[in-house]
C-alpha cells in the first residue's frame, strides 16, 4: 500500500496557485503542500516576506523545473504606504528610526513623486532581506546588528497607480505596483519617503499577481487541505511564452530529446514552449539560428 501511495504521489505534476496568508513563510507553505498532497518534490516560485499575503505559485513534481520561469516573471502588488514614519526594516515590523510631520503632503505631491519612479530604477536592497553579501544573507547580518554596504540593483517599474490618498500628520497612500523580478516594494516606499523628505514605510502589502497567476483565482490553504484546490497543468505556467505545437511522431521524438524541425523567427536565446496538440507541455526549447534547441523535456 505504501509503495502504491508513493507511486501515485510521484505522478502528481502541476502548479498550485495559492494564497499565502500573513504570518507564514514561503517555505511553510511549501511544507504544507507536501503534507497535503503527500509529495516530496515541491517548491515555491519567489519568496514573499512572512508578513505579506498574496499569490504564491507552488510547483509540484516535474513542474518544479518551471519554477525559475515563474520566479523570473513580472509581479503585481497592492501596497499601503504610511508617510512620516521610517523604520529600520522599511515595513511595519521594524523599529521606528525617524518621524516627521507630513501633514503638508497632498495627493498631488504623492502622484508627482510616483512619476519619478517609473521605468528602470536603482534600488539598494534592505538589510533585512535574503540577498547575499560575502556569502551571508543580509538578514543574518542584520540580526547581529551588522550593517554592510550593498550594491544598488536595477529593477523595472512598469506601473505605479495611486488609488487613494488619506491626508493627515501620517498620510497614507494606496497604490498598485507592477514590477520586475527582484523589486522590493518596501524599498520603493522608503525611497518615496526620502524623495518627499518626510520618511515612509510600507504598512501593508498583498501580491496580486505572479506571472500568469492572479489573486482572484488563488486557493487558500484550507481549500487545499479539503481537496478543493485545483492542480493546474504545467503549461499553465507559460503565460505569454512563445509556443510551437507538434503532434504525432514529432511529439514522440521531442519526448526522446529530439528537437522539432521547425523554423522560428524569435531572437536567439528566446525560450519557446513545445506543446502537444492537446496543449500539454512537452519541452522547453531555446531559439537558435532560426531553429530550436531543447533545454528541458517533460516526458
Swiss-Prot record:
Catalytic residues in the record: 49
GO biological processes: mRNA pseudouridine synthesis; tRNA pseudouridine synthesis
CDD domains linked to this entry: PseudoU_synth_EcTruB
Pfam families for the chain: TruB_C_2, TruB_N
GO molecular function: RNA binding; tRNA pseudouridine(55) synthase activity
Keywords associated with the record: Isomerase, tRNA processing
Lineage: superkingdom: Bacteria
EC number: 5.4.99.25
Statement: the UniProt record of this protein carries the keyword Isomerase: yes
Catalysed reactions, as listed in the record: uridine(55) in tRNA = pseudouridine(55) in tRNA
PUA domain mapped to chain residues: 241-299
HAMAP family per record: TruB_bact
Family label: Belongs to the pseudouridine synthase TruB family. Type 1 subfamily.
Task performed by this protein: Responsible for synthesis of pseudouridine from uracil-55 in the psi GC loop of transfer RNAs.
Annotated protein name in UniProt: tRNA pseudouridine synthase B
Amino acid at each position: 500500500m505504501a509503495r502504491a501511495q508513493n507511486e501515485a504521489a510521484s505522478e502528481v505534476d502541476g502548479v498550485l496557485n495559492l494564497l499565502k496568508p500573513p504570518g507564514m513563510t514561503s517555505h511553510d507553505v511549501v511544507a504544507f503542500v507536501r503534507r497535503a498532497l503527500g509529495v516530496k518534490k515541491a517548491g515555491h516560485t519567489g519568496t514573499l516576506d512572512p508578513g505579506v499575503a498574496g499569490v504564491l505559485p507552488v510547483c509540484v513534481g516535474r513542474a518544479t523545473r518551471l519554477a525559475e520561469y515563474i520566479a523570473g516573471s513580472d509581479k503585481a502588488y497592492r501596497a499601503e504606504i504610511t508617510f512620516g514614519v521610517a523604520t529600520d526594516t522599511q515595513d511595519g515590523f521594524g523599529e521606528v528610526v525617524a518621524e516627521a510631520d507630513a501633514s503638508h503632503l497632498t495627493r498631488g505631491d504623492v502622484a508627482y513623486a510616483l512619476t519619478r519612479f517609473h521605468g528602470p530604477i536603482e534600488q539598494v536592497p534592505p538589510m533585512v532581506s535574503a540577498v547575499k553579501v560575502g556569502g551571508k544573507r543580509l538578514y543574518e547580518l542584520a540580526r547581529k546588528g551588522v550593517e554592510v554596504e550593498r550594491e544598488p540593483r536595477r529593477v523595472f517599474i512598469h506601473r505605479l497607480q495611486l488609488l487613494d490618498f488619506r491626508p493627515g500628520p501620517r498620510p497614507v497612500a494606496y497604490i498598485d505596483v507592477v514590477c520586475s523580478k527582484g523589486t522590493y516594494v518596501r524599498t520603493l516606499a522608503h525611497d518615496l519617503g526620502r524623495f518627499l523628505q518626510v520618511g515612509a514605510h510600507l504598512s501593508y502589502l498583498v501580491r496580486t499577481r505572479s506571472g500568469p497567476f492572479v489573486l482572484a483565482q488563488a486557493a487558500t490553504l484550507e481549500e487545499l487541505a479539503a481537496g478543493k484546490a485545483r492542480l493546474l497543468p504545467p503549461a499553465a505556467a507559460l503565460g505569454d511564452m512563445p509556443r510551437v505545437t507538434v503532434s504525432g511522431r514529432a511529439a514522440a521524438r521531442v519526448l526522446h530529446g529530439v528537437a522539432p524541425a521547425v523554423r522560428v523567427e524569435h531572437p536567439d536565446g528566446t525560450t519557446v514552449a513545445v506543446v502537444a496538440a492537446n496543449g500539454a507541455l512537452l519541452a522547453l526549447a531555446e531559439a537558435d539560428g532560426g531553429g530550436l534547441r531543447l533545454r528541458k523535456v517533460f516526458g
